[in-house]
């Protein structure tokens, strides 16, 4: 009887230890998952401004070496890589959408061609396949360029960027540039002489009214700023035009895809709509990138003039 009791106690003891061990394993796994989730979540919160601050902090530690760069130059480079990644991520999403349309069109065209009951020719099928191949090639190039952009950006902040989700990229948005003229920009940046001479009543003496002392602007610097300003305004005009063209080609693409799905469309017209939308939308995104980078370059030049003075 005693042996039976002891064996029962032993079994209960073993079961208790097993349950405790299992509980500890589950607790450990949960803790690890929470830590990984927290790390991943924190990685997605790095905004453009935070990237700039991190890069400036890391750059300041290199003052004693030849790797140090002026702060305005670092800020410009960070913005350039950030805008590049932001643009190419959107272009990649668009390319994947076009890839799906091409794949679906190729499969349907092959069925029609093999059945011999439709108007799809060998040439039509070849064009769709070439369009698909070209889109797949674009996807490879964009994924490569995004990887390079992450490496370059990570080098500036001295931190590895593992994935695009580590930085807070959004849909590319044209930067707000409210200045209506170059003189308006110079006044806003206090780069225009504001001192005026007012002649006295007798015309012999003159009084000088001084406003806030403006930053000196040489003719050479004025020319550099004006060229950069023109780059911003021309890019802004292209963004406006590209936005209109994108809406037109998007509507055309939706119409051609729907027609082809219902069996009333033409493979040649679908091919042209896919190619046209790819070109127009990609060009529109490039125009946003060029505008944002041009504005960043103008800011860099302006800040460098402040620094020299």
Feature names for model-found ranges:
Residues 1-15:
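N-terminal secretory signal peptides that target proteins for export/translocation
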Residues 2-6, 34-50, 152, 156-168, ...:
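Acidic, low-complexity, intrinsically disordered peripheral segments
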Residues 21-31:
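Bacterial N-terminal signal peptides
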Residues 45-70:
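N-terminal targeting signals for Sec/Tat export/insertion, comprising classic cleavable signal peptides
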Residues 62-75, 96, 121-123, 127, ...:
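Sec/SRP-type N-terminal targeting helices
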Residues 73-194, 198, 231, 277:
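Periplasmic alpha-helical coiled-coil/stalk elements that build and connect Gram-negative outer-membrane
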Residues 87, 134-159, 231, 246-304:
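Short segments within alpha-helical structural elements
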